[in-house]
């Protein structure tokens, strides 16, 4: 490695076990060259996978696709040689192998672009490719914050619940990036349980690349991001309820049980936060209503909200 404007170069070497060694070196140009030596394969570990061209591309796409600097690699391709002119009657196409320097990473992540620069179709395609869904999301939430917590977030409310959503196998969490580098594929600490259906990505400049899961749980920045996202998701769902009632009622059919569970759990600690998102079937109105809509139509002498509980609407009705 040689700094710009310096006459000295240094070689840093480590076996990856304990410590490192630095010695003077010879280098004509400024910059850093990194050489990695792969361990020999063992019966259980196949390190040569890291030397496979497609394996390297996959690793870069997974962990460093959104690093803002280009990650380039020489790749070999085949192409047809130019046809001779004039072309003989017995001419057969010939092919040649050539090497091309390719940039492997996207560099500019979609969540760092202004919402006005991205179409609904581009958001939908990114969501379906990233999270393996076959339908467009019901809601796209873009959040950017600078100040006490610096982060970019791109969140999606799915149109339907995953097949395992109400099972113990379902894992909540958002993909967590630190300055464009993937740190954790599913960070559960970014979402409260009652919003566990939300999928998406959070990219923060305030997190260390080598932060552990245990350190994340104690990280104050993560708690600030959690609180900000919780408020943002709640506001977006409330906006959907107010401005697109039909879509919200479709959302409620898929995830309403989770919202109700959130209002009920922890001794009702979150009931105040979630009450405006709740929907109930009104026998009188013959449609879904919010608590506020019910209260607005109560007779002046009525003091309480009346309800009937049961396994189904029909079983809850009292026939006179």
Residue ranges and their predicted role:
Residues 1-318:
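Conserved GHKL (Bergerat-fold) ATPase module
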